[in-house]
Amino acid sequence: MATITECRAALKRLSDNLAAADGEVRGAAALDRTLSCHLTDLDTTFTGRLADGRIEVEDTVVGPPPWKAQIRLRMTGDDLVAMVDGDLNFAKAWASGRVGLEAGFRDLLKLRSLL
C-alpha cells in the first residue's frame, strides 16, 4: 500500500507533468479550481487548487474532504501512484468506477483532454 508521503510525491510529479504539458492538456490544466483528492485506503484527503497549470496541495486532512471542492477525485493511494507512473489508464479506471472524478459539466469537458 502506498504511503501518504508517496502519494504527495505522486501529486507533485503530476503537477510537474501538467506544468510541462502543451496543447489541449495545457489548456485544460490552466483552470483555476479548488481540488480534493480523497485516498480511500488511507482515509486521507489532499486539498488545494489546480491553478496556473499546476496542482498546489495546501492541506492534508484525515477522512473525506471537509468541503466540496470544484474538482473532486477519489481513489486508493496505489491507484494514484500507478496513474502518475503511467501504469493505470485513468479513463478506463474512471469508466469502471475504480477512480472517481466529480466536477461541474463545463470542467469535465475541459478535463477530458487530460484523460
Predicted features along the sequence, with ranges:
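Feature captures hydrophobic
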Residues: 1-115
